[in-house]
Amino acid sequence: MHQVPLAVLVASICLYVPAGATDTPNKVGSDELSQIVAAAQNMPDADLAQKFAAMELTDRLSGTRLADLTSRLPGDMSRRALMLIADQSIFLPPPADEIPLDAAPNAASVQQMLVNVVNYINATNRQLPNLMAMRFSNGFEDQPREDRMGRTGLESTFSLPLHWVGSLKVQVTYRDRQEMEDKSVKAEKKGNGVAGLITTGEFGPILSIVLADASKGKLAWTRWERGSGGTMAVFHYQVPEDKSNYHVKSCCILEGYNQDGTPRTQVSNVRSAYHGDIVFSPVDGSIRLLTMEAEAPAGALVSVASIAVEYAATDIGGRSYICPVRSVSMQRVHTTELSGGITGSSYKGPVKTFLNDVRFSNYRRFGTKTKVLTNLP
């Protein structure tokens, strides 16, 4: 489970199976990807999906550009394959042509931008109305080749690259500054649904926690970016472990067995240093993209724990609010053996990767029936 609660930022995962190796990817930039999509208008869905699966982006594909390219694709397989490579690029800098060469701001301007960001986050926490939205999650996992002891003897799994495993559509509410799943609306599940990684806190807590942590670490202006709302500023931050509220949890390490033969496990909980970018409007401080990447120590069970949240202007009840429209969560985790009497402290399995893509849409005020759609892919 991967959560962002109000008081402590937590990344965690529950698993009992392990990350497969893939062939060397074909590295392409966003512009080249756009050309590939334009040239593939008559390509079958499965063939185009396979073509995307062999690619790795070298720069960040913006949400706006992703939506445009997605609208041109022939089917679900190619859309999911594009989603996957785009999600993995969200932690990268944008293409060079989206980085203006304007002069760097002076110290006074940087300080004012920081004040704007602080004021924006404080205002968001106070002024965001009680609302409802649909949260649509797509889950991706890989599978390594592994031999392990099972109930009937040695069992082998075959290597698979990152692939779509399922989706989950639920209604969420944000009420009195608390985000929760609306159990009164039946969830819609496809495939195996979404397991392993679950995020919450995109509506405000994650912003407050990161800014509070970053203020105790290092925070500096790093570049300009060209966004859909004009020129954006970027702060890069680094948070040391002793100032961090980012805890990386991994479940489960085997401690031993109970008298009835069932495994007795514990959750590893490690406070982690982390870093990331805050992309925001220098005019009003509104956040457009937040990234977080844990700095795992050598030998850690969790080698990657990253979160990115993209925000955009959204109409709710006739007023415009900056709300989350997309989030990406990714973890790479060593599995631990739960059979054969080998403890997690003495055995680490191969690495398994989990990635979740989450989209928010159909925003409306709590208690109303009018649905306002956002322009999401």
Question: Language model features by range: what are they?
Answer:
Residues G20-P100:
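General marker for long, soluble alpha-helical cores
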Residues G29, V279-S281:
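Helix N-cap / beta->alpha transition motif
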Residues P5-Y16:
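Bacterial N-terminal signal peptides
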Residues F91-H275, P282-R288, E293-I307, A312-P377:
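Structured extracytoplasmic
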Residues L15-Y16, L69, N375:
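Residues in and immediately flanking transmembrane alpha helices
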Residues L15, A21, G166-V170:
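N-terminal processing/targeting junctions
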Residues M1-H2:
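N-terminal secretory signal peptides that target proteins for export/translocation
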